[in-house]
Amino acid sequence: MTPWELAKPGTEHAHQRALFAWAANAALFGFNFAWEEAAYDHRTREHVAQRIWANPVPKLTRLFAVHNQGHGDRIRGARAKAEGVKPGVPDIMLPVAQRGIDVMTCSGLFIELKRPKAVKRQGIASDKQFEWLAYLNDEGYIAVVCYGWEHAAKTIQNYMERKLTR
């Protein structure tokens, strides 16, 4: 399935699955392939692979989700809190530092993923989420809100290509 097909239900979870599918292709074959592959179904994979020279981005294999969603009933919520779950922590982290003469020093990228406006009602970040984003930015990370998997994928690509600034 393409990332667009994975995101079709319109939920934040669906968009997160789509983002990780896109990132897996980018890690193996590069950003150009990941965007082309996202546009086609898997029956055309050989055709796409022939058209685009692979330029893998292996550091994208370090992209991970922070399981910090609602935990159902009070007992599970209390257990999650005891295990260190914090409300408002961003959904996704890419622990890849960016350093260089012409680029700011940055410790990694955090993304709070929300539904895009085109799907239902656009997701809204909570006050706790904005507090975490501000804290992480102050600590030397780039921490942003992205609306939909495409916005998040473009943000990740810009970060990896050193085009993203705080």
Predicted regions and their residues:
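Catalytic phosphate/metal-binding cores of nucleic-acid and nucleotide-processing enzymes, i.e., regions
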Residues: 1-166
